[in-house]
């Protein structure tokens, strides 16, 4: 491998602003903002809008939408039109 071509991998604090949760995770993300973590150390800080704490798939609040097929949708909308014309 070539030396000095990979970004630095370091701990970064991610803040899910939708549920006010913080995560300390290793990342190569570059940011100028910092925050003091629970252990007393200062880490780079990055805000996110969706994480495993707020995404409906992971929280179990997912809604399942049943989509009809194109033929079923057509039949539902226009199926009665041809029956009275005979």
From Swiss-Prot:
Signal sequence coordinates: none
GO biological process: translation
A family per Pfam: Ribosomal_L31
Keywords on record: Ribonucleoprotein, Ribosomal protein
Keyword Metal-binding: no
GO MF term set: structural constituent of ribosome
InterPro entries: Ribosomal_bL28/bL31-like_sf, Ribosomal_bL31, Ribosomal_bL31_B, Ribosomal_bL31_sf
GO cellular component, one term: ribosome
PROSITE patterns: RIBOSOMAL_L31
Record-stated family: Belongs to the bacterial ribosomal protein bL31 family. Type B subfamily.
Assembly behavior: Part of the 50S ribosomal subunit.
NCBIfam families cross-referenced by the UniProt entry: L31 (TIGR00105), PRK01678.1 (NF002462)
Name of the protein described by the UniProt record: Large ribosomal subunit protein bL31B
Organism: Vibrio atlanticus (strain LGP32) (Vibrio splendidus (strain Mel32))
């Amino acid at each position: 491998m070539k030396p000095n071509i990979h970004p630095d991998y370091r701990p970064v604090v991610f803040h899910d602003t939708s549920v006010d949760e913080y995560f300390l995770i290793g990342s190569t993300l570059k940011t100028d903002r910092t925050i003091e973590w629970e252990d007393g150390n200062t880490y780079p800080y990055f805000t996110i809008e969706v994480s495993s704490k707020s995404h409906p798939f992971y929280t179990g609040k997912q809604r399942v939408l049943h989509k009809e097929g194109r033929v079923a949708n057509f039949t539902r909308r226009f199926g009665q039109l041809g029956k009275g014309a005979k």
